[in-house]
């Protein structure tokens, strides 16, 4: 099995805890490449972890301090794609544009994305390549959760609400009982649906 990659910070925590007058904080983060700008010997990428996104500044000589520059020239510039998982070790700083970022000192490739993601691109405030087709979003929910941040937030809020309600009712002595639900469209995985008719609505078929 692959070795575990140990992290010690999340993107949102790094931004919230950053102080300009403090000593540079060394962090280890991991996430998915959501965008990148390659400019010769230096590049910027946007890394997304389970909490949010943060910018990473990568230079060839920092991640390749020896004479061998293959990690930057070949792996990073040519082989890595949007959607790939990488690990970054470095220190936190603020760029000249005022954005809190990580200055990478070590890059580790963690996992390759088999298929390219429909990453949303912005230019002059206009979004391009948006993954907003309703049918595709429901059929490929895993992609929807990756590229559309609001969807993940909705699921997290829903899980929190259900967990809180269940805990409160359980503490009050209630018992949770699962009951079957009738619907007009048959469904299910391995279960065989049956047909019934509501007494008051004989013209309706329920499954």
Where would I find each of the regions flagged by the language model?
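Class II aminoacyl-tRNA synthetase catalytic cores and aaRS-like
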Residues: 1-205
């Amino acid at each position: 099995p692959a070795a575990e990659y140990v992290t010690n910070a999340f993107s949102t925590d790094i931004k919230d805890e950053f102080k300009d007058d403090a000593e540079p904080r060394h962090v280890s983060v991991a996430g998915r490449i959501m965008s990148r700008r390659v400019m010769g010997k230096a590049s910027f990428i946007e890394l997304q972890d389970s909490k949010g996104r943060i910018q990473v500044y990568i230079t060839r000589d920092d991640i390749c301090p020896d004479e061998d520059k293959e990690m930057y020239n070949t792996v990073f510039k040519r082989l890595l794609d949007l959607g790939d998982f990488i690990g970054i070790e470095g220190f936190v700083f603020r760029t000249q544009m005022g954005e809190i970022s990580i200055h990478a000192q070590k890059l580790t490739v963690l996992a390759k994305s088999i298929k390219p993601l429909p990453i949303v691109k912005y230019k002059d405030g206009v979004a391009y390549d948006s993954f907003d087709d309703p049918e595709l979003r429901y059929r490929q929910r895993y992609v929807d959760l990756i590229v559309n941040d609001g969807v993940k937030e909705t699921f997290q809020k829903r899980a929190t609400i259900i967990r809180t309600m269940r805990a409160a009712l359980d503490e009050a002595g209630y018992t949770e009982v699962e009951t079957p639900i009738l619907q007009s469209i048959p469904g299910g995985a391995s279960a065989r649906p049956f047909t019934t008719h509501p007494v008051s609505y004989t013209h309706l078929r329920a499954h």
